[in-house]
Amino acid sequence: MLDTRSVIAIVDDDESICRAVKRLLRSAGMEADTFTSGQEFLDFIDAVPWVRVECIVLDMHMPGMNGLEIHERLLQMGNCPPVIFISAEDNPLASEEAFAAGAVDFLRKPVKDHVLIESLHRALKRVERSDVNS
């Protein structure tokens, strides 16, 4: 049996954002995997069951499947870790939609490094609390 590996998933169609966030998380001692589409991320979850996604940094607007659709699919699968939505869109409705869907945070791009790290720490504390309670 394989050991479980825990990661933070970064799902954004902009590869440069994926790389930058992954570097930031590594420098903060966190392990991250990147995905440039929602389908790529969902395929990964199906194919690699020994990886535990502890939190998702999820772009709200991507070609194909948008962030809200990905989040809904995860909820349907019963496998939805905390989600931090990110978006370049300057529309107050976007954050309302994200929180209504169950997001733990909504951050506007460009996201300041310390803001993302603080948001991730809060989300991961939620994961720890739910692990203790289950």
What are the functions of these language-model segments?
Residues 15-33:
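Two-component/phosphorelay signaling modules centered on CheY-like receiver
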Residues 34-55:
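Acidic, metal-coordinating helix/loop segments flanking the phosphotransfer/catalytic sites
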Residues 69, 90-105:
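Alpha4 helix (beta4-alpha4-beta5 surface) of REC/receiver domains from two-component response regulators
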